[in-house]
Every structure is written in structure tokens, then in C-alpha cells.
């Protein structure tokens, strides 16, 4: 009697089909900048949008940390979350109120070269399926700008949430995921990026808590 599945070294044989063997890849150790939002005070980073990145790279170097996970977010003036609902409004260390062009990229790449600290990925943690269609569109447009920035900086991955529409049942959310989120994944792939899903059901995605980290 033949075996249903076996490995010949190059893959797993299932019947007449060969499934490629899993090849684990090491994860780069990095420090999420959102963990310390006020390393560069907001007033300073609002005035100089790239200062926070430079200071985070230097801080990581002092900690002997090889990389940072750079946090991006809509600026408090553009976000759908009331300021009073958050301790520090938003960890937008990557500030994209103005276009992230090649001049800005050169400045950050120079800081990376000077410190020897890399960017593991860019993180934009937001509810990409939020119920309000205008807010959802604004978040999707911002995510596309994050993708473009990652590509310009030579970063190969973006990390973020999927989210949930708290006004819909789960089956409806799955439909919304296919309609709204899959196109974002295709945009990431078109730029040569991997989208890393942060598996984290935030409290703000339930009907009893509309705002906390939503």
C-alpha cells in the first residue's frame, strides 16, 4: 500500500503532486518605534517630518539593535480617532502629510548608512475595513503611500492590520475583505512588497468601544 504523503528531500509528494517543502526564513530583530512615541516630541517632528526617523536610528544604534520597525500613521489632524481617546495622538514617525520624495529618501538612507541600523519594515496599524467609507478610503490611500515609501527606501515589507467593520457580521466582513483588502495586497505585490499581517483584534473593533486604537 502506497503512502499518502512522503518527502523525497525536494518536497512533499502527495499522490502525483509535489508540494514544495517549507523553507523557514529568519526574522530580523527590530524595535517598533510606536513603543516609544515621544522619543522625538511631537512639536519637533511636526516641524521636521524626518527628524524622528533619524533620532530613532541613532537610538537603536545606542541600544545595539540592528533594525527598527518604522511606524506610520495618519497625522492627528487627519485621523478619525478623537484626540481625547488616545494618550499620544498617533505614532506617525513616518510623516506622510507631504509627499515622501527622493530628497527625503536620500536623507533617511544617509542616516541608515551612518548608523548601520536598518529598516526591517514599515508598520501602519489601522482598521482597513472601518465602517465609514470615507475614513476607509482615506486609510487605503495612506496605505498606498506607505507602500510607495517602502519601495523608495528599499524596504521589502509593510506590516499592518486587516481590521473589521464592527457594524457587519463576520461573513460580511470576509466579503468586505475580498472586495476591499485583496486589492491592497495586489498593490503591495506590484511594488515587490510582502504584507505582514499583525494578528491583533483591537478593542476598538467591537461595538462597545468605538474608538480605542480603531
Identify the role of each PLM range.
Residues 4, 30, 160-163:
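Glycine-centered flexibility motif
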Residues 2-5, 9-11, 15:
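Residue-identity detector for glycine
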Residues 150-170, 191-204:
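Active-site groove signature of glycoside hydrolases
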Residues 171-178, 201-214:
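Distinct, well-ordered alpha-helical segments
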Residues 12-156, 171-175, 179-182, 189:
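N-terminal pre-domain/capping segments
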